[in-house]
Amino acid sequence: MTSFVEANEIVTIICYHALEKRKKMKLERLKKNNLARNMVIVLLVVGIISAIILTFTKAKYKTAESIPLVNGTINYELSDLNLIGVYIEDGSSYTKTDQIPDSGYTLNAEKSYCKIGEEKQDTTITYDMNTKTLNIAPMTTKGTKCYLYFDEQKTLLADAIKRDKTVKTRSLPLTTSSKVEDSTTGTIYKAQDDWGDTYYFAGNPTDNWVRFAGFYWRIIRINGDGSIRMIYNGTSTATTGTTTMINNGASQAFNSSYDRSEYVGYMYTSGQQHGNTTDSPIKDVVDSWYSSNLANYSDKISKEAGFCGDRNMASGSSWSSTPSSTIYYAARERLYTNKTPTLKCSNSADLYTVSGSSKGNKALTNPVGLITADEVAMAGGVYGQTNQSYYLYNNQYYWTMSPFNFNATSGFAYVFYVYSNGYLHYDSVNNAWGVRPVINLAHDVVIKSGNGSSSTPYEI
């Protein structure tokens, strides 16, 4: 039989367990309530963040605008661009238009600007004519107005010459069978000079005409430094006659002195093979003509390119001022014997340049000279072979600046010249023939108009 004390202990234990059970149930309910509350809080936070992101996204993209172009549209982002004024170059001024030009113009970034009210802003403006993409940065202030100025796209003469041309190379030697005398319009030939790749005309092209400083010129080649070499053709596009030479074809001796080897030099020094202290009479004539007719255009004439009067000797010849036997210069060996002309100048003392050039003898006062016999040969004037169908033919006699020989028997110095029927020949320096100056236009010269034909020459 259970005692009172034992019964009391049993009741106490039962009550304790019941109490513990109620505590556990209450704790579990509390945990469930806390979990539900936390889930609600998380959902609220996620909702708020999503709303913020959505708001900023809408704010960002609702400012996208478009500018109408000639073809298509370009998109850009901005805060509030009220106006874009578009101006295109029209001669010496600008004309306002209602659309960005489709081609033929480039953005003048220095002249273009944006402003807020009356205050100009420090912005960077770029425009890609190919992709039709306009960029304005920064663009963050409402009421911004931008003004875009477009300049007519300039075409470099060198680019215009090479545009749509077929580039060819020619194999040496240049024999009679390789003489170029046919129409070569649309063709230009590649070789090497002292500056790199050079592109020259040969045969009878009709697309190598330039009008510069009031005169017509024929392009000889694009030099390796990018300048453009040209020979004088006169005040008209007539290709024959005395008007294709300066001073209306007045004849000029290369040098009035003739009885020493050094007199073959465009410049010379008594007793020296490569001296350059004295001007030849023909150089005096060329310089005088330049000073009277081209000096005011000197900013468009190259100070880098030069003119080669090669005084190196041919194989088997040794230089002497008054040799006892005939001596020959290297150009005679190249053009008469081997038919292998070159546009490189093997001795820097014979490359006539002005002081501003990086190459040559820097002896010239004016950046003007004469054509070389090698250039005549590469154009089509093969030694001793008549050619009246190439662009250097003018039915006249005129000098080159390339030495030929010193004849010990006659006691005369000889220089190459172009014969009246178009081929290369030689004559004593004291004889008088025509003069056709050669200049090099600067590599960055642009054209106003023209396609290189005689009726529409490249206008500088």
Say what each PLM segment does.
Residues E6-N8, C15, A36, S348, ...:
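Intrinsically disordered, low-complexity peptide-like regions
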